[in-house]
Amino acid sequence: MMNSTILDSKFIIDGVPMELSPRQILGGTQLSYFPESIIDESLDPSVGAYDLDGNKMGDYLSLVRACPSRKLLFPFAGEYARARVAFALLDALCSKGHFVLEDLNLSVNWHWTDKGVGSMAAFYKSVTGLADYAADLYLQIADYSLVEGEPAIEVKVALPEPGRALPSVLLPDPESWLIYVPFDTSEYRLGGSLLAQALGVEGGPAPKIEDTGYFGDCYEVVREFVEDGIAISACAVGDGGLMAALDLMCEAGVGLDADISDLCRAAGGADPVRVLFSEIPGALFQIRDSDFDYIDAELLLQDVMYFPLGHPRTDGSPLKIHSGGKTAIGSILESLMR
């Protein structure tokens, strides 16, 4: 059974005493005494073998849709915790009101239970990973709790106004563009993802999710697009990766021919399945064709990488993915010549 004194305990992980208790890391008031130390060891991820087929994108998407939620695997506890913060902030990106990233406060709820070797070390690493990531983004953890349950972390963001400022589905404007901005510079990896979970693979590396400076730059400029009305629809890229977000944006019956050729090249020739299902935090947003030059200039000014994926389809066509076609520059030139 879990109890709150775990937050006040000192930890010894892999034979090394940790300097701070979880509560001290989170900035809370420590008990006047330290309960008995918790001794545990880390678990390394196993080797993950993926047999991926680029012709089965639809099948993979169906598997991801069927997953109720992403499980927390102990070897990826730190990465999972950082991703929870990033995804919560991305969910807030399109909210009403005026705010910047540093205005936001976090509320964190840990569900945890002692599952033997590796579980308590994973808890400690999730606390340090989450707290360090939040601190590097200059965010306050306003409150936190620990309750008994299957290991998971819930992160909520306190917002100045309820509700979204713009829709999360594509608007039927065939001249408009859908833009993808990854908010982290990590490699596209499948470890710990919903797709890996659906395929029964628990090993392999996960995205690190560590580049908070780049995340902040991306958040600032895309948030300005939302507040200034440049973005006319938008969707966060989180659990399920880019593929799940694209699918969500097409839910209202507007289709999309998405070309990820440039994205795959920028990712070092990464496999399209990895690029589409790796859970790197990011955002998709739709802009009018007349605003393309403006967002291009703003993103270049902030040194933020972006990828034009294509135009919405209003002829009843579903979401289609292309990964070996012309570059986005070629698509832009073709659009200008129409």
At which residue positions do the language-model features occur?
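Glycine-/charge-enriched secondary-structure boundary and capping motifs
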Residues: 1-30, 113-153, 219, 225-338
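Well-ordered alpha-helical segments embedded in enzymatic catalytic cores
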Residues: 80, 84-88, 217-221, 245
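A general structural motif
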Residues: 158-162, 209-219, 260-268
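A glycine- and small/hydrophobic-rich beta-loop-beta segment
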Residues: 196-228, 232
